[in-house]
A protein has these predicted regions:
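Phosphate/pyrophosphate-binding betaalpha-module
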Residues: 71-118, 123-124
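Acidic, glycine-anchored loop motifs typical of Ca2+
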Residues: 137-145
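Short, functionally critical alpha-helical segments immediately adjacent to catalytic or ligand/cofactor-binding
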Residues: 38-53, 98-101, 156-157
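Extracytoplasmic
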Residues: 1, 23-26, 34-43, 47, ...
Length: 249
């Protein structure tokens, strides 16, 4: 984490985020009030995914999805065969979703560009996510995630609110993370998932308490990071989980 942070959270990226927020403050405020997702979170996603729209991908989405759907690279490793098969099936479904999306949104899918995996727009939505979570933010009857900022902001916020399965998505006003204070005799453990499955009492029993006030009924997971000055321990709450559901990386 210490190495990744230095290379990724540069001053230029931070300054770019501030400028982007200032430029789109009114629309971001409206979306934040409607969905309960902070403007800073929405803009951070755009900054991470596409450098605030500076690079949305140069691959033709149709070609990328077709290649991964029918020519997914095989390693020849039997232990990876099942995983590679699932990935191929995933991209076949996304290819079908792309054709449906083109019909619904009147898009020329042959001209769309995006990532090598078929993600599109400033928020890098896959076709299935585009169809399920994109919203018309300005009332013009279309959902444009490439150039219409009201649609882009509202769609990212809507994704946060609705994506999450049985656990649900973003909780307005809820905590994201809190630095953990280690108690004497704390027990080392590393949860296998990002799911916030532990009560504060359970975490306290293991020797981890939040350094800042949080709702007593909140649940969390433990996140361990290799910081510049040694290992860091954080508690990740429901809204942290919602962020990981957008993109684990």
């Amino acid at each position: 984490w210490s190495e990744y942070r230095v290379g990724f959270l540069t001053q230029a990226r931070i300054d770019g985020g501030r400028r982007f927020i200032a430029e789109h403050r009114d629309e971001l405020t409206r979306v934040e009030q409607q969905y309960g997702v902070p403007a800073e979170v929405i803009v951070s996603i755009i900054g991470v995914e596409t450098n605030y729209g500076g690079f949305t991908g140069r691959h033709k989405v149709l070609d990328a999805l077709y290649t991964l759907a029918f020519r997914y690279p095989r390693s020849g490793n039997p232990e990876r065969a099942a995983y590679e098969y699932r990935r191929e099936q995933f991209f076949r479904d996304e290819l079908a979703q792309l054709f449906a999306l083109g019909r619904e949104e009147r898009l020329d899918i042959a001209t769309l560009t995006g990532s090598y995996a078929g993600a599109m727009g400033l928020g890098q939505f896959m076709p299935s996510s585009y169809r399920e979570f994109a919203v018309d933010g300005n009332g013009d009857g279309r959902r444009d995630l490439f150039a219409t900022y009201p649609d882009i902001f509202a769609s990212i916020a809507n994704y946060f609110r609705k994506k999450g399965g049985e656990r649900g998505g973003w909780v307005p006003g809820g905590a994201v993370v809190a630095r953990a204070q280690l108690q004497d005799g704390f027990a080392e453990f590393n949860p296998e998932t990002w799911t916030p499955d532990y009560t504060l009492a359970q975490l306290a029993e293991k020797g981890y308490r939040p350094l800042e006030p949080v709702a007593p009924d909140a649940t969390a997971t433990l996140v361990q990071l290799d910081g510049a000055d040694g290992k860091q321990y954080w508690l990740g709450f429901q809204n942290y989980y919602a962020i990981t559901r957008y993109n684990n990386s």
